[in-house]
Amino acid sequence: MSKQGFKNVPMAPALTWPERLGQYWKLVRGDRPIGSLLLLWPTWWALWLAAGGLPPLWTLFVFTAGVWLTRSAGCVINDYADRWLDPHVERTKSRPLATGAVSGREALWVFVVLMLVAFALVLSLNWLTVALSVPGLFLAASYPYLKRHTHLPQVYLGMAFGWGIPMGFAAVQGSVPLLAWLLYAANILWATAYDTWYAMVDREDDLRMGSKSTAILFGRYDLIAQGVLYALMFAALVLVGLRAGLSIAYWAGLGIAALLVAYEFHIARHRERGPCFRAFLHNNWVGLAIFVGIAASLALR
């Protein structure tokens, strides 16, 4: 469905400054940190592996702050791209752009400011990291528009969410070795899987509005496809562990992560909206388990 088929986005109501700041906070998902955590864990995986343990503190700060800034910017540009669609979807109709509490122009300014602050932080790192930030910006800004043209926006999200991995290796080592790309591939598979849970929540609305997703592409084979994605993710992480020479702590972390993923399938086995969303949220613990495995393995060397 084209945006001409949608009703106009409401005019912004009169708000006090505290109310307006609250709407900006909602716009950047400050009230929902799950997205930042899903972006943070693979970034920390990369930094710890690149440094062989605790990375330089300034580098850790830049990437941790950058995770929040870029994820927030990604949420803003996503809502801007979907401002015609969100008022018609139950889960998104209360977003600030959908209600008109924040205008499209305001949202673009928020996006620009967030990305400029993130870029300013990156400028304190080496030239390779700065150069890699440019395709990272393109990935973050273009992702929201993919759902109109392909059933694979979740794959693209994985590419965008994982770009901190090659950047992290570049910042610590001054290069991006094969290990970084193996980890990046694992993250793409992971993000595609967990965002498919998320897409399963919106599948009926997306079908009605003409949006595309892996949940729609997989159809009744969605749980099988999810199993394949998670299996490939763990296969890639096995290669990461072997190449990095990680110890038993890492393999224990992977084992715990696998059990957590199995529980996600139990939760979402009936494909209901609420359980699918819980399965999506549950991936925070998967990322944490893998990080603890990496950090413990490196600390015990």
Curated annotation (Swiss-Prot):
Q: Where are the transmembrane segments?
A: 34-54, 57-77, 108-128, 163-183, 222-242, 248-268, 280-300
Whether Cell inner membrane counts among this entry's keywords is yes
Task: Give the record's membrane topology.
Answer: Multi-pass membrane protein
- One short Pfam family name for this protein? UbiA
A single GO cellular-component term from the record reads:
plasma membrane
Instruction: Identify the pathway.
Output: Cofactor biosynthesis; ubiquinone biosynthesis
Q: What is its EC number?
A: 2.5.1.39
Cite the InterPro entries for this sequence: HB_polyprenyltransferase-like (IPR006370), Prenyltransferase (IPR039653), UbiA_prenyltransferase (IPR000537), UbiA_prenylTrfase_CS (IPR030470), UbiA_sf (IPR044878)
**Keyword terms:** Cell inner membrane, Cell membrane, Magnesium, Membrane, Transferase, Transmembrane, Transmembrane helix, Ubiquinone biosynthesis
Cofactor(s) of this protein: Mg(2+)
The record, for Gene3D superfamilies, names: UbiA prenyltransferase (1.20.120.1780)
Q: Name one GO biological process term.
A: ubiquinone biosynthetic process
- Subcellular location(s) of the protein: Cell inner membrane
* A molecular function GO annotation: 4-hydroxybenzoate polyprenyltransferase activity
Q: Give a short account of what the protein does.
A: Catalyzes the prenylation of para-hydroxybenzoate (PHB) with an all-trans polyprenyl group. Mediates the second step in the final reaction sequence of ubiquinone-8 (UQ-8) biosynthesis, which is the condensation of the polyisoprenoid side chain with PHB, generating the first membrane-bound Q intermediate 3-octaprenyl-4-hydroxybenzoate.
Q: Which family does it belong to?
A: Belongs to the UbiA prenyltransferase family.
- Identification of the protein by name: 4-hydroxybenzoate octaprenyltransferase
Q: Which gene encodes it?
A: ubiA
